[in-house]
C-alpha cells in the first residue's frame, strides 16, 4: 500500500485544476502545466482535491500510484509557487554571467561555455559565483541545474567546481611524502 499515493493532492488557492480522462491540467499564477497519468492508475477530482488510485494491485500499478501522485503534487506547487535551485561556483577565475539568452561560464577550460537556456526556465546570476535557476516544472529545473553542475563538478581535493547551494563536498587529503 503506497503511503504517498493514499493522500489526496489538495488544489492550492488560486489554482484551477481539471481532470479529463487520464490528463490532469493545472493553471495558476505562475503558468499552466499538464500531466498524463499512466493507464495503470485512475485519477479523479473529489472535494477540491485530486485522488489517485491504482487500477489493480499489480506491482507496476502500485509502483506508478505514488509516483503519479507526487507528479501531480509537483505540478500543483509549480503553478502556484514555482521551483528554484541555487548553484555556487568555487575556484580562482571561475565565474558565471548572463550573455543575452545564454549563460556564459568560465570554469578553467581554454574556452568559455555558452549554455542555451531552455524555454520555461529563468536563470539569474546575482553574483559572479552564484547561479539561480527557477521555473514551474520541478523536473526541468533540476535537470538544468544538473547539466550546469556537470560542466565542472566539485572535486574532492580543493573543492573547486560547481555545486548545489548547501551541498557537502567530501574532502580528501593529498598524498603524503
From Swiss-Prot:
Q: How does it assemble?
A: Part of the 50S ribosomal subunit.
The family classification in the record reads: Belongs to the universal ribosomal protein uL6 family.
Q: Please explain the role this protein plays, according to its UniProt record.
A: This protein binds to the 23S rRNA, and is important in its secondary structure. It is located near the subunit interface in the base of the L7/L12 stalk, and near the tRNA binding site of the peptidyltransferase center.
Cross-referenced PANTHER family? 60S/50S RIBOSOMAL PROTEIN L6/L9, LARGE RIBOSOMAL SUBUNIT PROTEIN UL6M
Record-level GO BP terms:
cytoplasmic translation
**Gene Ontology CC terms:** cytosolic large ribosomal subunit
Which GO MF terms are attached to this record?
rRNA binding; structural constituent of ribosome
Which SUPFAM superfamilies does its entry note? Ribosomal protein L6 (SSF56053)
State the superkingdom. Bacteria
Q: Which UniProt keywords apply?
A: Ribonucleoprotein, Ribosomal protein, RNA-binding, rRNA-binding
Its protein name is Large ribosomal subunit protein uL6
Q: Which InterPro entries match?
A: Ribosomal_uL6-like (IPR000702), Ribosomal_uL6-like_a/b-dom_sf (IPR036789), Ribosomal_uL6_a/b-dom (IPR020040), Ribosomal_uL6_bac-type (IPR019906), Ribosomal_uL6_CS (IPR002358)
What the entry lists under HAMAP family is as follows: Ribosomal_uL6_B
Amino acid at each position: 500500500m503506497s503511503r504517498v499515493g493514499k493522500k489526496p493532492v489538495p488544489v492550492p488557492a488560486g489554482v484551477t485544476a481539471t481532470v479529463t480522462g487520464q490528463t490532469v491540467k493545472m493553471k495558476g499564477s505562475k503558468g499552466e502545466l499538464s500531466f498524463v497519468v499512466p493507464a495503470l492508475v485512475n485519477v479523479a477530482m473529489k472535494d477540491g482535491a485530486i485522488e489517485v488510485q491504482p487500477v489493480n494491485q499489480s506491482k507496476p500499478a502500485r509502483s506508478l500510484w505514488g509516483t503519479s501522485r507526487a507528479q501531480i503534487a509537483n505540478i500543483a506547487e509549480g503553478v502556484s509557487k514555482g521551483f528554484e535551485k541555487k548553484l555556487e561556483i568555487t575556484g580562482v577565475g571561475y565565474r558565471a554571467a548572463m550573455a543575452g539568452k545564454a549563460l556564459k561560464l568560465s570554469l578553467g577550460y581554454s574556452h568559455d561555455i555558452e549554455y542555451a537556456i531552455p524555454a520555461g526556465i529563468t536563470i539569474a546570476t546575482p553574483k559572479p559565483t552564484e547561479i539561480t535557476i527557477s521555473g514551474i516544472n520541478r523536473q526541468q529545473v533540476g535537470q538544468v541545474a544538473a547539466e550546469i553542475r556537470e560542466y565542472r563538478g566539485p572535486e574532492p581535493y580543493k573543492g573547486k567546481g560547481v555545486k548545489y547551494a548547501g551541498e557537502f563536498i567530501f574532502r580528501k587529503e593529498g598524498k603524503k611524502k
